[in-house]
Amino acid sequence: MSNALPKGVFDIFPYVTSPKNLWRNSSLWKRVEHAAHRICNLYGFDEIRTPVFEKTETFLRVGEYSDIVKKEVYTFLDKKRRSLTLRPEGTAAVVRALLDHSADMRKDNKFYYILPMFRYERQQSGRYRQHHQFGLEAIGVRHPLRDAEVLSLLWDFYAAVGLQHMQIHVNFLGGQKTRARYDEALREFFRKDLDRLSPLSQERYHANLLRILDSKEPEDQEFIEKAPSILDYIDDRDLSYFDAVLAQLKALGISFAINPRLVRGLDYYTDLVFEAVTVVGEHSYALGGGGRYDELVAQSGGPSMPAFGFGVGLERVIQTLLEQGNSLSTSTRRLRLIPMDEQADAFCFSWANRLRNLGIATEVDWSHKKPKLSLKDAADQQVSFVCLLGEQELATKQFIVKDMSLHQSFSGAQQDVEQRLVYEVQNA
C-alpha cells in the first residue's frame, strides 16, 4: 500500500534542506507565524481558532456565485446525513463564532487567526488543497482610520518577515447608490459583446456582474481593460471615505496603487477592497488581500455591524521570501551537549535542564558516536552551538562551546559559559 500523500497537500517538516522544498521547513513557518503573532499583539488583536469543519450553511453565506461555494469546497454528509464543510476561508467562520458568543460581543471586535483552509484547487504552482492562511477580522467599527490601521498592520507584517517590492492595490466598490449606477453601466458595456466573453463570464453577467472583472480567462481580458471604471461613478460620500484612507496610506509611507478593475473573489465585499502584491518588473502577483464587508454579519443573522479584514496565504509568503533571496535560517539558536562517556551522561542530563530553565534551547546527543561524527551531525542539522564533555571537562570544570555558524569557540567555567549563551540567544 502506498503511503504517498494525496495531491494538493504537504508536510511541514523540520529536516527539509533541499532548495526545491526548503519552503516546507518548519523552522521557516515558525518564524513567519511568530511575526504574525507579534504584530497582531502590537495592534491589539486577539487570536481566534474555529473548527476545521462546520455546517455547510456557514460558508454558503460567502456568496451563492463565488467560486469557493460553487466548485471549491470539500463538503460531506456525516452519519446523520447532515451536510458539513471543511473550512474554505476564515471570515464566515469568525462571524459565525462571534454570533455564537454574542454575550461576549464588543462594540469593537478584533480577531486574527493562523489556520489551515481547504479548497479543491486546480493543481498549479503555489496552490494547494490544504493551505494555511494568516487572517484578520475587525468587526464593529466603520472608519477610514480603521481601514488604514489594518493595512498598516499588514504592511508591518510583510516588513517583519523581510518581503521586498510590496505594494497595496486598492479599489472602492462603493455603497448602494454607487454600485447601482456602476452595475447599470457595466451591464450595458458587456451586453453588446456578451457572446464573445468566456462561458464563465457569460454566466456571471446574469448572476454576479461585477465578478466579470475578476476573470482570468484570456478571451475576457480585452473587454475588461476597456470596461468603465467604477471611480467614474462613485458618489461624493464614497469618494471622501476612499480619499481619507489613501491619505493615511501616503502619510504612513505605504506604497499603493489604485486599480479600478480590482474586485475580490467573494461576494460579501463592499466599499474598500485591496490586494497586497509583490512587484517584479512589469509583473505582480498577490500575496494577500481583503476589504470591507459591512453586510455579512447581518446576512448571517446578527445585528448590522461593519467589518474589515484580510487573508494572507503563508505558502506564497514563504516561497516568495526564498525567491527574493532572503537568507532565512532554518535553525533555531540551540545548544547541543555531546557527552563522551557515561559519567558525562549524568552531568549533561542535569546541566541541560538547568540551561533550559535559563531560556537556552538545549538538547543532548546520547549516541556516543566518535566526536568527528557527532560534530558532522550537528553541522548537517544546523545546530547553533556544540559542547563536547568528557573526563577532562568534568575534572577541570572548564567547557569549550563551538559556534557552528561562525566557526569560532568560547570557553570558561560553567557559570561564565551559561552567561555567554544567554547573551548569544537573547541577541540572535
UniProtKB/Swiss-Prot annotation:
Domain of life: Bacteria
One record GO biological process: histidyl-tRNA aminoacylation
EC numbers on record: 6.1.1.21
SUPFAM superfamilies according to UniProt: Class II aaRS ABD-related (SSF52954), Class II aaRS and biotin synthetases (SSF55681)
Enzymatic class: ligase
One term under GO cellular component: cytoplasm
Cellular compartment(s): Cytoplasm
Catalyzed chemical reaction(s): tRNA(His) + L-histidine + ATP = L-histidyl-tRNA(His) + AMP + diphosphate + H(+)
Pfam families attached to this UniProt entry: HGTP_anticodon, tRNA-synt_His
Major location category of this protein: cytoplasm
An example molecular function term from Gene Ontology annotations: histidine-tRNA ligase activity
Keyword vocabulary terms for this entry: Aminoacyl-tRNA synthetase, ATP-binding, Cytoplasm, Ligase, Nucleotide-binding, Protein biosynthesis
Similarity section: Belongs to the class-II aminoacyl-tRNA synthetase family.
Assembly and binders: Homodimer.
UniProt-recorded name of the protein: Histidine--tRNA ligase
Species annotation: Chlamydia trachomatis serovar D (strain ATCC VR-885 / DSM 19411 / UW-3/Cx)
Lineage: Bacteria, Pseudomonadati, Chlamydiota, Chlamydiia, Chlamydiales
